[in-house]
Structure formats: structure tokens, C-alpha cells
Amino acid sequence: QTRAIINAALDVNKKHKNWHLEPEIMIPLVGEKKELDYVANIIRTTADKVIADKKANLKYHIGTMIEIPRAAVVAGELAETAEFFSFGTNDLTQMTFGFSRDDAGKFLGDYYDKHIYESDPFAHVDQNGVGALIKMAANSGRATRKNIHLGVCGEHGGDPASIEFFQRVGLDYVSCSPFRVPLARLAAAQAAIHADAEKKAERKSAKTLKKPSKKILYLIRQNYF
């Protein structure tokens, strides 16, 4: 797979002189840094040999999926090796809740009736549980590697409510099924606008607190001096 990816990128760059592809190779189902290092070393050795044999130059990146809870917990360690994270929210949801999407359909209806769950965790990201893991991993990853690229792949990447949450915790991109792309783009734009409006409101509030109005100062003087 590594040879195929690198060869494809080299061929494209050769045919299109104005293009400069930098392939990203993602390692799935990682939960231990030693495991990530082992696989990443194989990828680098293979990729570098292909590049050297072609007497070419090519920059590539190695990252990992964050799709098991342990990976989210040790994300700071994984970021020492990984240049990017992609949160696989389908598997992360399954492993966090302890049931699969296939099994969920057999009992989630009863859970809704009993008000145990308000919504399908495979349709809308569980912000209190799965979302907390994502936020923790994002913060830990950025603490280790400031410029780490963070994204999401899975059905949640096309859900507007989930996209707004991903925006709030600082993820850079979402990927989803092709038919969800238009909705995802609209939701991402709306989430960015909302986030920008909130920041402006916070800055305005902070300025107001730093500069009390003349009326407030007058009342303070009248009552306390």
C-alpha cells in the first residue's frame, strides 16, 4: 500500500509540474505508541526506498486514526510520532458504548421510550462521552505537536449538530459520504460563523468589563465614597 501511494504521488507530480502532492498515510486501530512507531518505521523505510529508487523528491506525512478509547487517552504520546489525527467516530462510538451499530437497532428503540438515550449516538456524536474523548485527544495532541492536523471521518462528519461540536473543540476538517458533502459544507460554514460571532461577543464583553461606563463609576462613587 505504501509503495502504491508513493508511486502514485510521484507519477502525478511528474505529469503535472505545477502540482506538489504530499500524501498522508494513515495507520488505523492504534492504541499504543510502540505499535504506531513500529508501523510508521516500516512505512518510512518503504516510502524512502521508492523515492530514492526514482531519484525524486517527495514530502509525505504519517498519521493515525483515533478510533479506540485508549488512543484518545494516550493521544499526547501518539502525537510524538503522528503528524495528524483522524477521529474514526463510528468505531470510537462502538467501543466507548460497548455495542455495535448492528446490535444497536435491536434495543435503542426501547432506550428512547424509556428516555435513557435521547438520540442515536451513531447519528449524532455523544458529546458527553465520545465527545469528551475527542476533546481530550485534540488538546493532548496539540500540547505535544502544536501544528498537528485534526479531523473526523465517519457518518458524524455529515451531521450538522456533530459538525458544530467538532468546530468548538478545534478540529480542522470533516470527511463523510459523498451525498452528505453539500450538507456538511453548509453546516461547517454555519459552525464557523457561530464560532466567530461568539468570539466577537466575548471580546466585546471583556472590553466592557475592563472599561466600566461613566454611569457605573458614578453609582460606585455615590454609594461607596
Regions found by a protein language model. Name each.
Residues 1-210, 214:
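Conserved alpha/beta-domain cores
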Residues 217-219, 224:
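Short hydrophobic targeting helices and cationic amphipathic motifs
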